[in-house]
Amino acid sequence: CKGTYTADNDAVKANADTVVATVGDHQLTNSQLQVFYWMQVQSFLSSDYGSYMMYYGMLDYSQPLDTQVCSLADNGETWQQFFLKEALGTWRNYCALADRAKENDLKLTKEEKKALENVEETLKQSAEHYGLESVEELLKYNVGAGAGLADYTYFQQLLMQGNKYYDAE
């Protein structure tokens, strides 16, 4: 994770299908990475620790993350690099857990399958709740211009599959 992950919307969309990581049989595209990245950022910011970091000025979310040195790292990496590394690690862990679930024949329940089938409708309701016109607008706002419904659904599916094994242990 070196340099910056920031790009204009056209470049992001043009590189959406570029494979940026591989682990086993799993491949992660740039657009899927966006979902993992922004979910990581949002999770951190909503945590007590993230609130603490912002309150004491160690992270300023109003400024670009690729311009701020991460106070959690001693190697000079930026907050953007920190979250990118965390997102890749999370994806790798989700893949490993999903693989273990498959190896142990742990399948999604009917309710979990239905939840995945209803991701679009759930996002549509969220978009309406926040006064947005579409799922695409909601996703653009939450995870960036290059990521779409399929990328968000991939995140949810991998999470659910991995949780089958994680919760079984």
Can you annotate each of these PLM segments?
Residues 158-169:
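Non-catalytic, conformational "gating/processing" segments within enzyme and secreted inhibitor domains
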Residues 1-3:
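Bacterial signal peptide processing site
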Residues 7-149:
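N-terminal targeting/tethering segments
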Residues 146, 150-159:
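Acidic, Ser/Thr/Gly/Pro-rich low-complexity segments that form flexible
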